[in-house]
Amino acid sequence: MGEKKIVVVQLSGGNDYLNCVIPYDNPHYVDNRPNVRITEDRVIPIGDGLGFNPVMSLIKDLYDQGKVAVIHGVGYPEPNRSHFRSMDIWHTAEPTKVGNEGWLGNAINQMYPKHDNVVAAVNFGAGLPRALVSHGAPVASVTDLNTYGLMNHVSELDQRNEALQAFKDMYSQAIGSGPVMDYLSQTGLDALKGAEIIGGVTDKYSSDVEYAENSFAKSMKGAAQILQADIGTRICYTQHGSFDAHTNGIALQEGLLTDVSGGIYDFYDDMKRANKSDDVIMFVFTEFGRRVKDNGNGTDHGSGGVAFVIGDQVDGGQY
């Protein structure tokens, strides 16, 4: 068995806990959701009066194999129901104060205190989630692995190499000019090195798994490509949404959960076929659940939500 890796999936906007893992025969659920309720005939039962959303059949397959842990009622004290503050808490693991560093960024620095792994973490999407932010923690943000890299628009190899060398020289010469320039220059060099490493992973990837044509599936395929390449990446991060279903609640959530369930299943299948699944777990979370009572055809911000941990090394079941 090799180094352990984690793929973090953020369901942005507040995934509706009660329509994801459904207490379908609970009278409080039935009475409070006359309009935004999944009826018993559509639910995929998992026992104890609970069932998965009807579009989560692929997650149910993994659940039946003992690969899925369902973690109920996940939240934090004195919930404020704000998207922004809730995400801050999830990203920093600081429920009582505003934190500056992310829990995954801190984990990177603990694993690599010398900052010598420039591809320790990869975020799929624009920007950088606060969860991955920590002083000195190297993180690459990728929107498309097929086009990722520097100077890819320069077709002539010699010209491209000359341009890259110019950047390396520029950053290298600034080191030793003071702490600020040292930090900026080292960050630049790390970015160049990381882009060179990550830019080559698609050439090494071969798989028969056919991912769906949506942004989440694309990110999960990218995570599989990165992790199967064994370049040293320990953390992959992606997000999907928005699950903020104040209106059109059932249709919106089911469309997004279809993407998520398919992407997770295909990623697991891909890693399994490559004999890499033993070393990887997936952690799926959302900032909060939705209120028990519907608001007509949607739901408003709630508190406790549901999280999932998925993988070969997971002791599946309900927690």
Where do the model's predicted regions map?
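Feature for exported/extracytoplasmic and membrane-associated proteins, marking the mature portion
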Residues: M1-A274, V309-I310, V314-Y319
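Metal-dependent active-site segment of extracytoplasmic phospho-/sulfohydrolases and closely related
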Residues: I264, M271-G296, H301
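C-terminal, helix-dominated tail/subdomain
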Residues: N297-G311
